[in-house]
Amino acid sequence: MRKVIGIGETVLDIIFKDNKPVNAVPGGSALNAIVSLSRAGISADFIGEVGHDRVGSHILDFLKDNHVGVSKMEISPEGQSHLSLAFLDEENNADYL
């Protein structure tokens, strides 16, 4: 069986609506694509980096919960996982910081 491998950045998107945080979800373009493929039943792995912190653990758990292989993920003991702030407008379009 063939497997799709995604390579990219990992971030935790903190979602704001009316300037208040309402959700936090793992993201990054390649990560989102790989999770979508895995949810569609396609075997998938992801290669990226997270920090050795709570955010990194949350991202790894999210990938595992979505049946994405994480054996090649780099866990940086010195680095911190990346965060992104996404502010939604009235039509739920995001403006990222």
Language-model-detected regions and their locations in the chain:
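Gly/Ser/Thr-rich beta-alpha loop segments that engage phosphate groups in nucleotides
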Residues: 10, 29-30, 50-53
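A general structural signal for well-ordered alpha-helical segments in protein cores
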Residues: 4, 30-34, 56, 82
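Short, glycine/charged-enriched secondary-structure capping and boundary segments
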Residues: 19-22, 60-62
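Short acidic/polar alpha-helix capping motifs at helix-coil junctions
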Residues: 1, 22-26, 47-50
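Beta-barrel outer-membrane channel/assembly domains of diderm bacteria
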Residues: 10-13, 33-40
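Conserved N-terminal subdomain of the carbohydrate kinase-like
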Residues: 43, 47-97
